[in-house]
C-alpha cells in the first residue's frame, strides 16, 4: 500500500515537472528561436552521420553553415524588440545580449569554411568536429543571455567541455594531448573558484540567484558592502579571468594555442573572449553595482598586466601561434578598458566595435596560418621568410591582418583602438589609455618584424619550406581562402561602415 502511494506521488511529481517544462518551452520557446535552430542542426547532423556514408560530407558542411546563417537571420529579425526575461528568470533577451550572440555566430560561421581543407588533409573525424563547434556555439549563446547564477555556470561549462575535446582532437599529437591536459586542469580549477564566488554572492543576497534579484537581496539584507561581497568579487574575477585569459590567468593560453589544431585555435581565440566579455560585463555591472570602485580597480590591474606582459613576451616568440597567443592576451587588455568604462562615455559601444574588428583581424590571420601550415607543414616564424615571392596574395593578406592587429591607419584595428582609447580617456582612465597606446606601438614592432620576413627577396634568407611552396590547384574552390578574403576585407575597409557599426553598438544598453 505504501509502495503504491509512493509510486503514485512519483508519477504525479514527474507529470507536474514535465508539464511545467512543456509550458515554459511552449510560451518561451520563441525567445530562444536562434538557439533552437542550432539544436535542430545538431540533430540533423547526427541523423545524417548515422544513416549515410562518406559521400555525404558536403551535406554535413551545408547543414552546419546553414543552421548558423539561419540563426543569425533569426537574431537580426528580432533586433530592437523589447527586452524579455523568460524561463522563470533564467534567460534574458535584449540588444546587448543579442549583439554578442551575433558575434559568436559570426565567428563560428567563418570558422567552418576555415576548417574544411584542414580536416580533409589531416583525416580527422568530421561529424564530431562540427558537433563540438555547434555545441560550443550554443553554450556561448546561452551564456550571453544567462540571467541567473546557475545558467551562468552551466552555459560556459558546455562551451568549455567542447573546447577541451576540440583542443585535443588530434589525439596522436603529443603537444595536443599536453595542451588538453593543461586546459582541462586549469578549467576545472577555475570553475571551482567561480562556483565558490557564486556561493558567497548567493548567501549574501539571502538566497537569490537571478542577477537583478541579487541586487535587491543585497539591499534587503544590508550586505552590499560586507566582506562577503568582497570575497565573492575576488573569486568571481579569478574564475572569469580564466575564460578571458588576461595576465596573470594566461598560463594555459600559449600551450593550448601551440598544441591545438589551428582551426580550433582560431575558433577558441575569438568565441571564448566574446562570450566571456558579455558574461563579465553583466556580472560586474549588475550584482556588483555597489562595489564598482573595487571591481574597476581589479580590472584595471588585469588590463595593465595583460597589455604589458602580453606584448612584451610576444616579441620573443618563434612560433606564430604562440606569438598570437601572447598578442591575444594584450588584446584582451584593450577590451577590458571598454568593460571598465561601461555605459557612460560609450564604453560598451567601443568594446563591441573593437571586438567585431578583432574577430575579422584574428580570424584572417589564422586563415593565413592554416593555409601556410597545410602547404609547408611548419609554424615557425622564420619559415615565412620570402613568402611574397611564392604567394603574393597570401603574404599581402597576412600583412594586412597583422598591421590591423597592430592598429596602423587606415585599417580597422586603428579605428577600433582609437574609439576605445577615446572612450577610456573621456572616462578619466588616463593611465590605462597611455599604457594601451604604448603597448600598441610595441605590438607594431613584432608585427612589422614578421612582415619584413614575408617581403624579403634575398635567396639566402628564404627557407626550404618557402622554396618548395606549392599553391592549391583548386584556388577558386578553396574554402579557407573564402574566409580569409572576407576577414581581410573586413579588416581593411572600416571607414565606410564605421558610423553604422558605432550606432548599432550604442543601442545595446541592458
Swiss-Prot record:
Pfam families: Ndh2_N, Proton_antipo_M. GO terms for cellular component: chloroplast thylakoid membrane. It is a multi-pass membrane protein. The chain crosses the membrane at residues 24-44, 57-77, 99-119, 124-144, 149-169, 183-203, 227-247, 295-315, 323-343, 354-374, 395-415, 418-438, 484-504. It catalyses: a plastoquinone + NADH + (n+1) H(+)(in) = a plastoquinol + NAD(+) + n H(+)(out); a plastoquinone + NADPH + (n+1) H(+)(in) = a plastoquinol + NADP(+) + n H(+)(out). Its main location: plastid. HAMAP family: NDH1_NuoN_1. This is NAD(P)H-quinone oxidoreductase subunit 2 A, chloroplastic. It comes from Spinacia oleracea (Spinach). The lineage of its organism: Eukaryota, Viridiplantae, Streptophyta, Embryophyta, Tracheophyta.
Amino acid at each position: 500500500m505504501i509502495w503504491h502511494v509512493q509510486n503514485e506521488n512519483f508519477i504525479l511529481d514527474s507529470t507536474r515537472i514535465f508539464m511545467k517544462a512543456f509550458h515554459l518551452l511552449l510560451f518561451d520557446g520563441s525567445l530562444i528561436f536562434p538557439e533552437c535552430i542550432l539544436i535542430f542542426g545538431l540533430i540533423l547532423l547526427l541523423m545524417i552521420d548515422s544513416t549515410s556514408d562518406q559521400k555525404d560530407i558536403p551535406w554535413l558542411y551545408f547543414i552546419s553553415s546553414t543552421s548558423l546563417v539561419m540563426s543569425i537571420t533569426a537574431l537580426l529579425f528580432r533586433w530592437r524588440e523589447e527586452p524579455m526575461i523568460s524561463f522563470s528568470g533564467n534567460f534574458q533577451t535584449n540588444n546587448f545580449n543579442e549583439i554578442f550572440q551575433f558575434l559568436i555566430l559570426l565567428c563560428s560561421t567563418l570558422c567552418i569554411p576555415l576548417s574544411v581543407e584542414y580536416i580533409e588533409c589531416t583525416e580527422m573525424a568530421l561529424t564530431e568536429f562540427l558537433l563540438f563547434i555547434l555545441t560550443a556555439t550554443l553554450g556561448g549563446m546561452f551564456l550571453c543571455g544567462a540571467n541567473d547564477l546557475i545558467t551562468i555556470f552551466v552555459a560556459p561549462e558546455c562551451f568549455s567541455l567542447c573546447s577541451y575535446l576540440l583542443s585535443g582532437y588530434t589525439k596522436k599529437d603529443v603537444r595536443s594531448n599536453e595542451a588538453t591536459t593543461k586546459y582541462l586542469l586549469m578549467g576545472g580549477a577555475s570553475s571551482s573558484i567561480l562556483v565558490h564566488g557564486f556561493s558567497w554572492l548567493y548567501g549574501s543576497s539571502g538566497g537569490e540567484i537571478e542577477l537583478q534579484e541579487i541586487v535587491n537581496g543585497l539591499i534587503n539584507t544590508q550586505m552590499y558592502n560586507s566582506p562577503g561581497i568582497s570575497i565573492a568579487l575576488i573569486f568571481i574575477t579569478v574564475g572569469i579571468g580564466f575564460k578571458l585569459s588576461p595576465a596573470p590567468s594566461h598560463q594555459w593560453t600559449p600551450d593550448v594555442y601551440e598544441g591545438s589544431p589551428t582551426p580550433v585555435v582560431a575558433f577558441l581565440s575569438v568565441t571564448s573572449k566574446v562570450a566571456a566579455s558579455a558574461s563579465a560585463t553583466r556580472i560586474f555591472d549588475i550584482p556588483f553595482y555597489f562595489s564598482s570602485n573595487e571591481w574597476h580597480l581589479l580590472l584595471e590591474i588585469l588590463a595593465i598586466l595583460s597589455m604589458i606582459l602580453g606584448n612584451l613576451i610576444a616579441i620573443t616568440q618563434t612560433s606564430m601561434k604562440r606569438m598570437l597567443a601572447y598578442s591575444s592576451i594584450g588584446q584582451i587588455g584593450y577590451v577590458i578598458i571598454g568593460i571598465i568604462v561601461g555605459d557612460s562615455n560609450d564604453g560598451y559601444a567601443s568594446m563591441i566595435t573593437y571586438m567585431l574588428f578583432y574577430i575579422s583581424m584574428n580570424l584572417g590571420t589564422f586563415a593565413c596560418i592554416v593555409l601556410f601550415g597545410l602547404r609547408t607543414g611548419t609554424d615557425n616564424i622564420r619559415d615565412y621568410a620570402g613568402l611574397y615571392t611564392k604567394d603574393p596574395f597570401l603574404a599581402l593578406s597576412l600583412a594586412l591582418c597583422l598591421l590591423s592587429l597592430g592598429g596602423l591607419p587606415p585599417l580597422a584595428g586603428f579605428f577600433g583602438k582609437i574609439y576605445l582609447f577615446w572612450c577610456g580617456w573621456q572616462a578619466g582612465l588616463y593611465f590605462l589609455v597611455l599604457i594601451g597606446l604604448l603597448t600598441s606601438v610595441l605590438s607594431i614592432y613584432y608585427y612589422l618584424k614578421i612582415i619584413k620576413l614575408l617581403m624579403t627577396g634575398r635567396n639566402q634568407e628564404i627557407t626550404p619550406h618557402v622554396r618548395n611552396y606549392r599553391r592549391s590547384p583548386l584556388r577558386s574552390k578553396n574554402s579557407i581562402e573564402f574566409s580569409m578574403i572576407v576577414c581581410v576585407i573586413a579588416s581593411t575597409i572600416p571607414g565606410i561602415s564605421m558610423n553604422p557599426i558605432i550606432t548599432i553598438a550604442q543601442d545595446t544598453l541592458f
